[in-house]
Amino acid sequence: MTVQILPIAASHIPGFGRALDVVAREKRYLSFLEGPPPEAVRAFVLDNIEHGHPQFVALAGDEKLVGWCDARPNSKPIYAHSATLGMGLLPEFRGRGIGTRLIRSTLDAARVKGLHRIELTVREANASAIALYRKVGFLTEGMRMDAVCVDGSYENVLFMALLL
């Protein structure tokens, strides 16, 4: 099945919201446990489009949205050179190189936009994501111990960054 990597468009909002919800409900990857309300998803995407913030989606087969990657610039002036990376893939599309394609597209767009630093947080147990981030050049800057608690289980969170 062919998977296309494209800049997000308004027509992708419903699929993006569904994908966010699926990945969030796994409780293993994102900082929220269910997808945001549709109006919040819509506002996020439209703001990214309006301001040219890097956000890409992976579309499989008949345009099913199966993943995303975005780099949201920091709104505070002293941090405006940096952006926070967020990404996710539906479970059945992991391990196929789609994440690598998504992140490379997003990083390329961040360079064009003039961003200097991309940062992210990742749970220490998410070895595949950490390997992906290292593969594209991210370095670990630090760790917050027991920073996440899901269903009574604590997890460490790594801080990673890449200078463009």
What do the predicted segments below correspond to?
Residues 4-16:
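A short beta-loop-alpha structural element at the N-terminal edge
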Residues 7-10, 24, 28-92, 103-105, ...:
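Acetyl-CoA-dependent GNAT
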Residues 63-67, 128, 154:
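Glycine-rich acetyl-CoA-binding "A-motif" of GNAT/NAT acetyltransferases
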Residues 97:
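Conserved G/P- and acidic residue-centered "switch" motifs that form tight phosphate/ATP-binding loops
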Residues 103, 110-121:
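Conserved GNAT acetyl-CoA-binding A-motif
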Residues 155-164:
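Terminal substrate-recognition subdomain of acyl/acetyltransferases
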